[in-house]
Each structure stands twice: as structure tokens, then as C-alpha cells.
Amino acid sequence: MSNISTPQPRIGFVSLGCPKNLVDSERILTELRTEGYQVVPRYDDAELVIVNTCGFIDSAVQESLEAIGEALNENGKVIVTGCLGAKENQIREVHPKVLEITGPHSYEQVLSHVHQYVPKPTHNPFTSLVPEQGVKLTPRHYAYLKISEGCNHRCTFCIIPSMRGDLDSRPIGSVLDEAKRLVNAGVKELLVISQDTSAYGADVKQRTGFWNGQPVKTSMVSLCEQLASLGVWVRLHYVYPYPHVDDVIPLMAEGKILPYLDIPLQHASPKILKLMKRPGAVERTLERIKRWREICPDLTLRSTFIVGFPGETEEDFQMLLDFLKEAKLDRVGCFKFSPVEGAAANELPDQVPEEVKEERFHRFMQLQQAISTQRLQDKIGREVLVLIDEIDEEGAIGRSMADAPEIDGAVYLNGETGVKVGDIVKVKVEHADEYDLWGSRV
């Protein structure tokens, strides 16, 4: 029994960036725990620190470089992975003392480097029990389900393909097995993520896989149909506006998956969309939105846009505002264009001055805030299902079907004590502001 008291080697871990990066962190942490390593929250307790970086925009690069610097100062032994890891020279210029650098989703390389500097412990199942669903960094009641890596698009403002490569879809049986494990472990909401969710299966020509002994096509629609059978909330993120997105709307109307679509549209001027290398048929987009809402009246639409893109005139920007007025999207994120090292858009002529970007950003947000506020006001008096995320001294806080974690609003149940985290309850909406709802259990 002497093995049981052998101290486990201790690893520190810093995870930055988007939910896709979070899933990569979960995978690495699961492998470390499975091999008997202990993951610790303090630099001075760790024998080595792994930093999983983001490199999408300049502020994210800066945050990643600062996190690496902090880990070096506080600990000294650092392995870097993630999107910024694809730019090794950029890291080495600032932090030459980093031990090893790998790009994103290089799980085996990361573990190999860990073994090199902190040898693998004697494996003992009593000290390294790992839940079947793996290590999760989200609360127990929801989880991110990553279905693919990379992207085949070449949007001029984006460098993701240069960091994460072309589309690489996971086998559908593997995705569904993971989803089943998560649900069995108590997950009530699956958030489907990737760089390009609607392209799922395109790289393998939608080949037929197998799950539960049945043939299943590798496609977003087939995946949604199968996930619906698990009896939990299924939420779609990062859905590029391909024509076949129309096919998931009936599934939402039937209650099989959540009536929620995160669909980045980026702009509404055909000229700017062409410069971005994005689909440019704005009238068709408005027609589709109208049709989707006819099929599924409860549909929540979230999108993101970029203002101040090179070449954007006041006329182009006005087209974007007109689009917002007509589309009446529920949730919207807006970014001021900023050059990302390696992005094709940096070389475009007619760069927009910073003060103009700032002014357009504020006009955009002012308009959209009024639209979002009205969309929420319209829910007053209605009954909605709410997934409880948190209990505090004032009551319970949760999310409706219209709210993704981290990025959308919340539903506050002040004074509510009869619920626990992970419960799904019916709530009558009594009050709203521009982001959140307040209500009472029915």
C-alpha cells in the first residue's frame, strides 16, 4: 500500500480565450489527472505551469503574453500551448525562457513535454480517479461539446485557419458518445461549439457514421436530431449562415433543440461583406430571418458585427444600422475593427480612423440596445423555462432558453429559496431591462 502515499506531481494550469480553448484545456487536464498528476491553483505549489493561450485579436495576444510572463515570474517553468502557440517566434521574442511551445489542440505534445520536465507518476487508480465525462471547467449542469476543429473559410479579418487549420470534423459517433456521458453525469445543457458549426461533416462529405447501432450522417442537422434524443437543452453556437441552416429551424419549432441561433453576420453592406469574404446577399438574409420566425416564433437570434472595417463609408455603416432596425435581432455583439497580425484585411486600403470607429460603435450599440430592450419588454407577462445557475443571498439566478452562459442575460428570481443549481423551473416574467429579466416561479 506504500504507493498510495506517494506524493503526486503538481501542475499549475492557466486557461485563456474562448469556449473552444476551454474544451482543449479540459482535455489536457483530463489526461493529466488520468496519469496521476495533481492540478493545483497556486503558482508556488506547482512544479510546472501550462498556459493555454488565445491569439485571436491583439488584446488577447497581449493578455496571453502577460499570463506567460506572470507564470514565469511566479514559477519559472512554463509550457505554452493554444492559438498563440502557433506563433512561436512571437512568444520567444518576449519570453525566451519558456520551456516548450505547441500550437492549439496538440494534446499529446503537451503531455509529452510535461513528462520530460515532470516525470509521470506511478499510476495508482486510488489517487487519480477521473469521472467518466472527464475533467470539466464549467459548472456541473452545462458543458461545451466541441464537434470540429479549424475552418475552411478565409475571412479577411480572421487568422483562425492559420492557427487551427482547415475544417476537421470529429466522428459523429464519438461526439454523441461524449454527449451521452455528459448527460449521464448530470449535464442539463449542451452547448455545441466549433469554429464553423454548420460546416460539420463537409470535410468528410457527410459520411455515414454509427451510433447506438444505427447509421447517422455526419452533418449538423443529423447531429441535432440525435442530440435531441438525450432530453436536455441543446444550444447551437458559431453557425455560419449556409442555406442548410434553414433545416434546423423546424427542429427548434418542435422543441427538439433550443430555439436559439448564434449566427455571426459581421456586416450588412454588400461591399464590406465582399471585402470581408463573407456572404453578401443581405436581402436574402432578412427574408430568411422572417421565414425562420414564422416557423419558430420563439426563436432567439444572436449575432456579431464589425464596425470600422477598412473601406467602410458612412453609407455602408448606415446600411448596417438599417439592417439592425429591420432584423430586430435579440442579442448582438459589436467589435471595432482592429488589425490582427497576419490578417489579409490589414493590407486593405481606406483604413478607418480610430475616432470614427469609436463613434460608429457607440451609434451601433445605442440602436441595438433599444432593440434588445424592446425584445425583452415583450416577454413581460409570459412564462419561460429557466435553468438555475446560481443561488445567492437574494434568491436564485438562472437563464432562459434565450440566454447562453457568459455572453447573454440572466433571469433573477429574487427571494426564491426552493430551487437548486441545475433545476429547470417555469417562471413568469415580471420585469425587464436591456439585458436581463426578473420573475417568479409559477
UniProtKB/Swiss-Prot annotation:
Subcellular location: Cytoplasm
Disulfide links within the chain: none
Gene that produces this protein: rimO
Gene3D superfamilies linked: Methylthiotransferase, N-terminal domain (3.40.50.12160), Nucleic acid-binding proteins (2.40.50.140), tm_1862 like domain (3.80.30.20)
PANTHER family documented for this protein: RIBOSOMAL PROTEIN S12 METHYLTHIOTRANSFERASE RIMO, RIBOSOMAL PROTEIN US12 METHYLTHIOTRANSFERASE RIMO
SMART domains hit by this protein: Elp3
Protein's UniProt name: Ribosomal protein uS12 methylthiotransferase RimO
Organism: Pectobacterium atrosepticum (strain SCRI 1043 / ATCC BAA-672) (Erwinia carotovora subsp. atroseptica)
Classification via PROSITE patterns: MTTASE_N (PS51449), MTTASE_RADICAL (PS01278), RADICAL_SAM (PS51918), TRAM (PS50926)
